[in-house]
């Protein structure tokens, strides 16, 4: 029975979907004005893991992850580049899709773009005004009146006065309260705009998600997820909008993944430690990056460093080595089939504890190596597949395409051939020199009756 940590209640809760057997999940996606970074990679991989587990558990899942394709940053970047906004956003949507596919992230059922749902946003704003929870300002903006929603602060666990004291709020004469937030922005020269009852303008960021998830799921659904940085104000404001418009509970379970740090410092462009997914994939295999993310609990901070990625590569190589040594038999996924399957399920049902689930994979690999059991190797591959891992040909992974600074497969084969010739000529010193050179360059040789095989360390 699945239990998950609910940010709203600040405790683990037994998961009970609104409709038995069916789950609706919405995750806040990317604002597409630049290439995706490591923080985006974690959101993608974490909620892909959640989606895979819900489906493996037998749920009929509908997964929606939105795309923000209108935003101040997008408008600014398009102006800097001198290109149309839709050209800029499509380029980065395509790049995002490439990054996600490389990381083994399955596409959500729906990926709505904010610009496709502006009429829905206008309708929700009208509902909020009609209930006295929003107001049109003289300048053409529309604001949410936070004092008119009694539940404001429930997700962050702070009262409105506490939030106001702790936030740096710009004084805006158009607002009734400094904590009021914008629902509709009046048009500015040169910016995209849509007609509305309040004049030409565009939606605020927060209303976009409320309108899109209502379009797919109605006013009440099961799981809403995103990065921890979205808990306040974005998700707090979503609750205010959706519950303020419909006077019913919005979301049953809120999930937030932890931050990524780089060498124990916050990732930021100003510190020069900001990495895009593409930059990381130039150095490391994409499955290694996915494995690195899943080795940590999704709510824990994740520290990125070259040492940690190298450790992840070495660990994943051990699992693939077990599959290379013992060909995997086909096994049907039955959670009561053996103790490994039961413990894997128990780990994942405990708030998606991939740390313990991966530990089960290592136990399986060790036992499969020891017993030479094709069935256990089959379970290793099958359970790994639930996490989106271990589905490649083991030799292909272990010999992998060379990454930045690595020796190529062709060069390895040439050196192995030279070593073979040296051994045939009983030139043991040259044979040892070649082996030592390969070891120094991260290549492990394994001599057997069928010849010499190799893998990356």
Swiss-Prot record:
InterPro entries: Cys-tRNA-ligase, Cys-tRNA-synt_Ia_DALR, Cys-tRNA/MSH_ligase, CysS_C, Rossmann-like_a/b/a_fold, tRNA-synt_1_cat_dom, tRNAsynth_Ia_anticodon-bd
MF GO annotations: ATP binding; cysteine-tRNA ligase activity; zinc ion binding
Binding site residues for ATP: 269
Motif ('KMSKS' region): 266-270
Pfam family, one: CysS_C
Sequence motif 'HIGH' region, residues: 30-40
Keyword ATP-binding: yes
Xref: SUPFAM superfamilies: Anticodon-binding domain of a subclass of class I aminoacyl-tRNA synthetases, Nucleotidylyl transferase
Example GO BP: cysteinyl-tRNA aminoacylation
Statement: the UniProt record of this protein carries the keyword Nucleotide-binding: yes
Location of the protein in the cell: Cytoplasm
Catalytic activity: tRNA(Cys) + L-cysteine + ATP = L-cysteinyl-tRNA(Cys) + AMP + diphosphate
Comment on bound cofactor: Binds 1 zinc ion per subunit.
Chief location category: cytoplasm
Binding, Zn(2+): 28, 209, 234, 238
Cofactor: Zn(2+)
Cellular component aspect of the GO annotation: cytosol
E.C. code: 6.1.1.16
UniProtKB keywords: Aminoacyl-tRNA synthetase, ATP-binding, Cytoplasm, Ligase, Metal-binding, Nucleotide-binding, Protein biosynthesis, Zinc
Subunit and partners: Monomer.
Family, as annotated: Belongs to the class-I aminoacyl-tRNA synthetase family.
Protein name listed in UniProt: Cysteine--tRNA ligase
């Amino acid at each position: 029975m699945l239990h998950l940590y609910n940010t709203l209640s600040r405790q683990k809760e037994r998961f009970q979907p609104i409709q038995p057997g069916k789950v609706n999940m919405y995750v806040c996606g990317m604002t597409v004005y630049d290439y995706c970074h490591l923080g985006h990679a974690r959101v993608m991989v974490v909620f892909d893991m959640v989606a895979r587990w819900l489906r493996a558990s037998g749920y009929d899942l509908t997964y929606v992850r939105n795309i923000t394709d209108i935003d101040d940053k997008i408008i600014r970047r398009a102006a800097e580049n001198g290109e149309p906004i839709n050209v800029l956003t499509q380029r980065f949507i395509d790049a995002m899709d490439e990054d996600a596919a490389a990381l083994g992230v399955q596409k959500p059922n729906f990926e709505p773009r904010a610009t496709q749902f502006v009429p829905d946003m206008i309708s929700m704003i009208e509902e909020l005004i009609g209930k006295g929870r929003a107001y049109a300002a003289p300048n053409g903006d529309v604001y949410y009146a936070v004092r008119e929603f009694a539940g404001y602060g429930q997700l962050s666990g702070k009262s409105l006065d506490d939030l106001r004291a702790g936030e740096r709020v710009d004084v805006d004469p158009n607002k009734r309260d400094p904590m009021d937030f914008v629902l509709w922005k009046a048009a500015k020269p040169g910016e995209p705009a849509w007609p509305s009852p309040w004049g030409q303008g565009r939606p605020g960021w927060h209303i976009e998600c409320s309108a899109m998830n209502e379009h797919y799921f109605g006013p009440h659904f099961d799981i809403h997820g995103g990065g921890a940085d979205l808990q306040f104000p974005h998700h707090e404001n979503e609750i205010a909008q959706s519950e303020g418009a419909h006077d019913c509970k919005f979301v049953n379970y809120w999930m937030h993944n932890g931050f990524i740090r780089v060498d124990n410092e916050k990732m930021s462009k100003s510190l020069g430690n900001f990495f895009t997914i593409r930059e990381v994939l130039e150095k490391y295999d994409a499955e290694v990056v996915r494995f690195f993310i899943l080795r940590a609990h999704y709510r824990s901070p994740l520290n990125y460093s070259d040492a940690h990625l190298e450790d992840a590569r070495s660990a994943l190589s051990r699992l693939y080595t077990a599959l290379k040594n013992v060909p995997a038999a086909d096994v049907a996924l039955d959670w009561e089939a053996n103790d490994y399957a039961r413990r894997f399920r128990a780990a994942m049902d405990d708030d998606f504890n991939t740390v313990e689930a991966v530990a089960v994979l290592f136990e399986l690999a060790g036992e499969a190596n020891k017993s030479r059991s094709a069935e256990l190797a089959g379970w290793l591959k099958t359970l790994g597949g639930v996490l989106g891992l271990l589905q490649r040909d083991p030799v292909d992974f272990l010999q992998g395409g060379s990454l930045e600074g690595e020796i190529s497969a062709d060069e390895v084969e040439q050196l192995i051939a030279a070593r073979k010739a040296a051994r045939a000529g009983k030139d043991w010193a040259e044979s040892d020199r070649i082996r030592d050179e390969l070891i120094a360059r991260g290549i492990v040789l394994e001599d057997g009756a069928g010849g010499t095989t190799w893998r990356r360390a």
